[in-house]
């Protein structure tokens, strides 16, 4: 199987390339990435001589290029997206351009290149499209039937892209599935995200910026578990079906912070309280029962503290990667996002 992967130089995408190629079988990947701020070709630099892997620099809004690449491949895994909530609050326009217009362009290219609807299309999305759960109802979980209720510009853009994929399935018979995942963690994650942000700050002797009261809850999923689930959906998912992917690993932000501090040998004096994010969702929690029942997938790498310790160790062992990432424009963004909120 030859896969067109969009956004393969990002965090989840680059891990998917490594995981999929390492899984064995007759599989190759064409990685299409525009190399925006979080797309880092260094993530996959060591695969340059692997004949199962090819990189193409390009934009998913380029209809002709997308149709050409889809025509060469057997399936599409669509990960290319703007994904950071805080950036969407600052300026939502790139999120609309990439997540909404880009997804529609990709669907148009798929219809042009695959009029018989033979090629599988996996649209990788987020649990944030479901909105927020109350902290006082731990029994409530997001299921695939939970109404869509996005609360941030980022979540709204991803919800729109999900609806476009569903419309393409219903109207044109596109052979697509949608996945909605919880918060990912692992190696090669851009350090605007909370775990690599906190870990690299502490390595540099800086405090960690904790939003609000720290009681917001997220479900944490190791990126390799996520990649395994995406492969299962790609190979065995039902046309038009949505699959929630979670780690069964709910943690409050303050609990996450304390665990990172403890593993790295720091105390609460390294916490810098900052003004809360506007409209900060209180709790995300995934019911991943459907993918377990129908495709036989369950998370096996997401359990803490081991998975968190291994992730922290990766950032400790790879300072040359994240120090380059945290230079230049990132520092200006960090000051804008956290410096004025302390």
Predicted regions, residues:
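Residues in well-ordered alpha-helical elements
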Residues: 64-67, 86, 93, 104, ...
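Hydrophobic alpha-helix immediately C-terminal to the catalytic Tyr-X-X-X-Lys motif of short-chain
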Residues: 160, 164, 168, 198, ...
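Short, solvent-exposed loop/helix junctions and linker helices
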Residues: 6, 89, 97-100, 154, ...
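Proline-centered helix-kink/hinge sites
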Residues: 92, 150-153, 181, 187, ...
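Structural element of the ATP-grasp superfamily
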Residues: 106, 165, 198, 291-292
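A glycine/serine/threonine-rich, flexible loop-to-helix segment
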Residues: 47, 136-137, 191-199
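N-terminal Rossmann-like NAD(P)+-binding domain of SDR-like oxidoreductases, especially those catalyzing
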Residues: 1-184, 315-318, 328-341
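C-terminal substrate-binding subdomain of Rossmann-fold SDR/epimerase-dehydratase oxidoreductases
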Residues: 15-19, 23-24, 39, 58-61, ...
